[in-house]
Structure formats: C-alpha cells, structure tokens
C-alpha cells in the first residue's frame, strides 16, 4: 500500500514500477495486490474533515480554508494523469462534508520548480493575494501529505505564513497532517483491512 491518497505517475506509478521490476526477478512470484488511491473514500474524507474541525474549535473558524496540494507540471494533466482531477474531487468532498461556502474555500498547488507551467493556482502567489484581500484569518491544510515534512513545515508553515502575514493577513493557522494521530492510524488500518478483505 503506497501512502499516497491519489494517483500520479511520478509517485504511485513509480512505486508500482519498482514492485513489478522486483517481480520479474523472482522465480516464484507471490500473489500481490496494489491498493487503490483513496482520495475520495469516506474514511479519508472523514479523517481530514475531523482534523479541520478540531483546528477550527482550537484556533477559531477562519475567513477562508486553503487546501494546498503538491504541484505537478501542467503537461501531466494534458497527457492524461488523473492527479489534478483527484485533487479537485478531494477538495469538493471536503467542502461538502464541512458545508463550507465557495467564497470561504480554495485549493492551490505548491512546490513547483523549473520553467514549465505547473498546475495552478500556485500556493505562494495565492497566499500573497489572500493577504492583500480582506482575508484576516487563513487556515491552510495539506491533505495530500500523510505526514509533515519540509514541504509542509518549512514551505507552508514558515515561508507561507510569512508571505501571508507580510502581505496584510493577521492570523495564519497551519493544520498539521494526520501524521501518527489516532485519526491517521485509524485511517491506515481501515484502508488496509478493506484491501485485505478478499484475501484473509
């Protein structure tokens, strides 16, 4: 099971390729099952939504909730990679689950590099624009990451916070990844049991 909630060629497919390469080298090949992406499963949506609600109770309801996903070159979308569409569906399902109005919700894409166009809107530019608007309290979550890392802790919670506050925002709340919380571990347990249902 690849701990990636959505499919993308450079991530999930790369893992699958390595598994298949290993299988080619085996004289006796075991039965294998590759878990499906879980970006739209009730278990995942409920876990992320609960994390968001817990943050709202602790830090207050923001003027806007921003979901920042890892970016990818735009050409991947044009070539048929479903990643962008799966990010959009995750966002829609979370928005519906939390009953958030369109004007209080956005998705964006972070971590771009190189010169070619990537999926938009870009998170860094979005944070600056939101600070310049009448958005005083912004909450940001990175639902595409199962655990916090340099791209969430530094790029969003440090650099992103600074961009938003320096452009006029007053309060920036970073909502951590599920990490090893009870919700995070329960999610992985449920997903594993679902995949194993026909095997054990």
Regions found by a protein language model. Name each.
Residues 4-200:
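Extended amphipathic ligand-handling, pore-lining, and cofactor/metal-binding catalytic surfaces
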């Amino acid at each position: 099971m690849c701990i990636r909630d959505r499919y993308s060629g450079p991530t999930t497919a790369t893992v699958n390729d390595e598994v298949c390469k290993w299988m080619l080298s085996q004289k006796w090949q075991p039965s294998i099952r590759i878990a499906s992406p879980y970006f739209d499963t009730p278990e995942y949506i409920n876990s992320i939504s609960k994390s968001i609600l817990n943050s709202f109770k602790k830090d207050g309801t923001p003027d806007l909730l921003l979901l920042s996903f890892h970016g990818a070159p735009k050409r991947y979308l044009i070539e048929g990679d479903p990643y962008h569409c799966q990010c959009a569906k995750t966002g829609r399902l979370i928005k519906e689950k939390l009953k958030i109005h369109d004007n209080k919700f956005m998705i964006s894409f972070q971590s771009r590099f190189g010169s070619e166009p990537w999926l938009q809107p870009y998170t860094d530019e979005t944070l600056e624009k939101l600070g310049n608007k009448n958005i005083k309290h912004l909450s940001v979550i990175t639902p595409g990451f199962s655990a916090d890392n340099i791209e969430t802790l530094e790029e969003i919670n440090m650099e992103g916070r600074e961009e938003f506050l320096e452009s006029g925002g007053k309060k920036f709340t970073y909502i951590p990844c599920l990490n090893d919380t009870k919700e995070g571990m329960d999610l992985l347990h449920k997903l594993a049991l679902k995949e194993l249902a026909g095997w054990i």
